[in-house]
């Protein structure tokens, strides 16, 4: 087979006698049929087969409805073996099925559904996966077997339901209309009374019959004739498929007798066909060519086409990043030619095959209501979110501190909502506490922080029971902690014996396979920095060795490879380590799937430094296709790409600047608090986790600016491709490139395609924030190492901005507070704004830069909001225009600096929450001059002659009669009134300048967002 498949099952003739059956543990003889269940490897980013004898496969509990669709390799079997497997699929593995008796009733063996069952609850521990209520001991319960995507090695696992709940979800669970209670495995062990009850609850559903009056003469006869014609056609096709299969296998059998493997390779090469690996694959390709003709190269990429079940698939690559997606049932061919030297072989002398086209079985798809194969999709929805009345299903809640309700009341509320109470931090999905407890950060709260569990207020419990908002929205609204990743949800059922699994974990890899939904920054890698790079702690040598540096080049590489089609999201890390004291050298490498602990590592001690360098360079070239010292890297198909990750020596500087700040600072307390807020490393990490950035493969501040700019360029290409309606393979190629450059943590999920404007816009926003975080972190790492100075003062100096606290009783403070109060838009009613502090700011060199525009008419004091993590970049470098590499999508009027005259319009860009309600917002003087007024989106790359800015006209505007002028600058602080402009797509005004020199930042406000509690 040419490429790995997404199919869950596989069948083939055993290539050797080495494989053992996972069921009976006996060896599987060579050339006998073996069937496999494909599972995610714990050792690398890919799937491996768990092989079974044909008879053992069905005993495990696997259920297949359409072997020709669900099983990889099915069509390559001999015809009789295909029929055997079809029969076993219908009967749950039995082949001794008798036909109907003379009366045609009752003598046919009924199929027992292996993936559906009935029985009595053995305890009170099981929970119905529909209503989430307990199933009492001794009560009848029904099951649907599923495969959990995060634990595929466990195989088929029972998910239990009350009979009534099962009936309600019948179609969703794939219990087909023709099935009834009698088909359930275990039905016969129920009492006669329970059997009768269940038969009434779960009967076979017959098709709706016509009313007598609806029958029209002749219709039934036509239907009968039509069905007979169709049946004859099916029989004819079946005979043709059998004849074709027999012919192919006859050719293969004769070739095996007449030719060696090398002979078969020569035949392929002579006919300009690629030679695959594996004897059986070579034989398949030669037989295909001899029967149907030699395949011509793919028209799109010139790759090799290969037969795979339902069509011929291209195995080539459209680019170095992406495989070709061509699939056809009618490939172009030429005549198969047998070389002269082969014509002396007796088989080839008498060989006469009439050239023909390959016949394919009709495209069969699983009927509506049929049981879907037990893949990731089969896992019940409750794993991720509970039913509306049980929103905390499968979640464990930890409570800390004094709450308004006592512990029993809180426990009752949580259990009513489907959750469970826990006293252990590392088992918790969520923590409910108070702001006071979070600020106090006692030992228990430290454990919560270490486990990276979100902390929410008690109000969360009240809102979730009545609110129509999603769980994630409510979590954000009530969040109290600055830390916390995605909420963990425990699997819905105890899916196997504790501490055991179907696959033994490698001694080299650390920990079990990560569960989907596990929090994304839970595992923190401590990097020991020596010399030019961080020593990987998994090597066990972080305290004894360092990464070799020679000729200015650090012998450490982090590589990435993403293939959305295959679902892989892989990394490979390579390091050459040198002992700190002795002349000893090691090569350390680790590999796996990004964002999970799937993977392994290897440490090899080398005889000498020269051997170590040679081995390192050999491995690097093997993985990337490029020489280590090559100046211009060229990406090769199916090869890794290097990530420019800067493991500089500045990590200790960051630690120094974040330990005990404020003890020696002489700055005013509000300014000290502002600096701490701007340089808060935890907030930066939280922002990266929100964007699904992998903090292990791309630690904070480590991705280079150049690589971020390259990612912008890819997004620009995506936008262009979408607007031009480019091919799917082009979009796929760009998506693969983007995710390789910027490592994302998708767990076990496939990386999503960047195939719409919204996904591009979201990634642009992510890169904007990454750039600012990169600036903030660079500032933290660089500059003065004067230990006599307070860390806050050191960071303050790096901003190169004079920051003064504005007296709350001053006139300018009064004007600003009035501006905040009056311009809060009526539609932005989820919160009120409270001014905490006002700072007057003067960026170094900005007033000089602004001087030419000081004389321009129409200067206004306007709002600009942004995330707290962006302010180190804003204050140190000013408000900037998106880089040239960035796509124009997401910018309503092109790339520029955007302002608003309504405070809440800008405040929405602060991205605060109830748990993190403090935001920062700017007031900047913008030299607008002559404004180009627009009502709808338009990409502006160059302003019309005589225009200095753009104004997006909104339906609401501050009352112009209430505006005031301060030092020649208009302050539009009137309350919102109708602008009289109705045919506009904007609710509120927007102002855009396209030259950074037209902006002079004046004030920075610290605002508290007082979120209003939901009333519904």
Swiss-Prot record:
Region listing for Zinc ribbon, in residue ranges: 293-335
Positions with biased composition (Low complexity): 365-386, 496-506
Chief subcellular location equals nucleus
Residues bearing PolyADP-ribosyl aspartic acid are 389
Give the Basic and acidic residues compositional bias ranges: 512-523
Binding residues for Zn(2+) 3: 298, 301, 314, 324
Q: Where is this region: Automodification domain?
A: 376-526
Question: Catalysed reaction per UniProt?
Answer: NAD(+) + (ADP-D-ribosyl)n-acceptor = nicotinamide + (ADP-D-ribosyl)n+1-acceptor + H(+); L-seryl-[protein] + NAD(+) = O-(ADP-D-ribosyl)-L-seryl-[protein] + nicotinamide + H(+); L-aspartyl-[protein] + NAD(+) = 4-O-(ADP-D-ribosyl)-L-aspartyl-[protein] + nicotinamide; L-glutamyl-[protein] + NAD(+) = 5-O-(ADP-D-ribosyl)-L-glutamyl-[protein] + nicotinamide
Any inhibitors or activators noted?
Answer: ADP-ribosyltransferase activity is regulated via an allosteric activation mechanism. In absence of activation signal, PARP1 is autoinhibited by the PARP alpha-helical domain (also named HD region), which prevents effective NAD(+)-binding. Activity is highly stimulated by signals, such as DNA strand breaks. Binding to damaged DNA unfolds the PARP alpha-helical domain, relieving autoinhibition.
**Which parts of the sequence carry N6-acetyllysine?**
100, 108, 134, 602, 623
The PARP alpha-helical domain sits at: 664-781
This protein's UniProt keywords? Acetylation, ADP-ribosylation, Allosteric enzyme, Apoptosis, Chromosome, Cytoplasm, DNA damage, DNA repair, DNA-binding, Glycosyltransferase, Immunity, Innate immunity, Isopeptide bond, Metal-binding, NAD, Nucleotidyltransferase, Nucleus, Phosphoprotein, Repeat, Transcription, Transcription regulation, Transferase, Ubl conjugation, Zinc, Zinc-finger
Residues in the active site?
990 (for poly [adp-ribose] polymerase activity)
CDD domains per UniProt: BRCT_PARP1, parp_like, WGR_PARP1_like
Annotated Zn(2+) 2 binding lies at 128, 131, 162, 165
| Residues found modified as PolyADP-ribosyl glutamic acid | 409, 415, 437, 446-447, 450, 458, 473, 486, 490, 493, 515-516, 522
Q: Which residues form the PADR1 zinc-binding domain?
A: 228-362
| Chain sites annotated for binding NAD(+) | 864-866, 873, 880, 906
Which residues does the annotated region (Disordered) include?
360-390, 494-523
Comment block on domains: The two PARP-type zinc-fingers (also named Zn1 and Zn2) specifically recognize DNA strand breaks: PARP-type zinc-finger 1 binds PARP-type zinc-finger 2 from a separate PARP1 molecule to form a dimeric module that specifically recognizes DNA strand breaks.
The name this protein goes by in its record: Poly [ADP-ribose] polymerase 1
